[in-house]
């Protein structure tokens, strides 16, 4: 079944080939995608890139692969770890309506499913290679983090 609009939520710290795989898979099921960039209000070692930086990574990658025209919008979503209802309300305000969501984050999926949102989960793409924790660690240890980013950002 083809849906009109889908939603992908992620931190994208940074946007890497695994995320590109998710976008490509999702676009097989929808006409347009909304990308919600989570943890927009957090800056720490697990969230080193700002929303604006992550949005640029996403746009550049999707433009390179001629997918940017399939993105309805890219929005920022702040974390509210103790208030799932408020988080979902903020998500709805920023994204508007969507028909389906895609992802593997069980906390996010639980919030969405408890509110009647259908979720499609895809197998993770080369998780041993494309995992944000490992990529961020490699960036931290590198004398030239830009080379590491080029290695992982599609």
Residue ranges and their predicted role:
Residues 1-154:
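Nucleotidyltransferase catalytic core that binds NTPs
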């Amino acid at each position: 079944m083809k849906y009109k609009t889908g939603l992908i939520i992620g931190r994208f710290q940074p946007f890497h080939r695994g995320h590109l795989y998710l976008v490509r898979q999702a676009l097989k099921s929808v006409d347009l995608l909304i990308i919600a960039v989570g943890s927009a209000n957090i800056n720490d070692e697990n969230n080193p890139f700002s929303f604006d930086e992550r949005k640029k990574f996403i746009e550049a990658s999707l433009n390179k692969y001629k997918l940017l025209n399939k993105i309805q919008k890219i929005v920022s979503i702040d974390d509210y770890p103790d208030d799932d209802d408020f988080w979902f309300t903020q998500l709805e305000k920023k994204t508007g309506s969507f028909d389906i969501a895609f992802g593997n984050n069980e906390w996010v999926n639980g919030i969405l499913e408890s509110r009647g949102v259908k979720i499609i989960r895809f197998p993770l793409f080369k998780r041993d290679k494309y995992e944000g924790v490992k990529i961020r660690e490699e960036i931290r240890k590198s004398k030239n983090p830009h080379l590491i980013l080029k290695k992982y950002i599609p």
